[in-house]
Amino acid sequence: MDVLKSLPVTDNHIHVDDKHGYGAEKVAKTFYNAGGKVMIVLNKPTFDGNLTASMDILVRDVEIINKNTPVKAFGLVGVHPAELTYLMKFMSLEEAKQRIVDALNYAKKLVEEYDFIVGIGEVGRPHYPVSEDVWKASNEILKYCMELAKDIGCAIQIHAESSTEEQFKEFSEMAKEVGLNPEKVVKHHCGNMVLEGERYGIFPSILASRVNEDVVKKSLRFVMETDYIDDLKRPGVALGIKTVPRVTRRLIEKGVLDEEGVYKIHKENIERIYDMDLEL
């Protein structure tokens, strides 16, 4: 019997794309057949000027997964930070910033309207070099996202440059300034940042390929992700959809993780971040 059959397995950062990839239903079924149980799905950046259409598509995709597959899916909606520099090709920084703020207000409405939309993300700041003005505006947008999350009592997933202790400290202080519990702040695409997460309250979402014995021995206060992209023209650009179940299974078989540890990472931490009760 598969060791994962009765265990929760959650991928905390997935993109699905009916237009360019396999689409929501096929991706979810592949994930489930590999041993996955819960998907946290986020809308992709579109770079076409329409910042809300992808959020509506995300709502539809999560509904499709929950209706047509055994997987439990939840969504986060937001504006990817790279959209700012894209919009600036056609308008001023201030105009682009206002367009993003308007879209984030729409994201807030979706979180309030749908029980399965559980947070705002991915939002943050560019992971590539930008001007001081763009960096400042990106941080202002990120702080506004935190204010929205505080107002509606939800989590936020941050896309930013590579994680450091100083960054975790900065995000923690930013959250506290607006009254948001840092535990509701998830840093996407992390490496081994579990101790820094404990120190500053930020929740690290660690790439499954980087979850190993060293990480698990330090702390189980993290979640796992692939950042799966679902684009047939870009195979291998991110981890495959089967990776979180595969890595979890391997850690169990090696004796690194026991059942209690699996429940901690894949169920309890997810419930804690997103204020949900996973009935699996």
From Swiss-Prot:
It holds the Pfam family TatD_DNase. GO terms for molecular function: hydrolase activity, acting on ester bonds. Belongs to the metallo-dependent hydrolases superfamily. This is Uncharacterized protein MJ1127. The lineage of its organism: Archaea, Methanobacteriati, Methanobacteriota, Methanomada group, Methanococci.
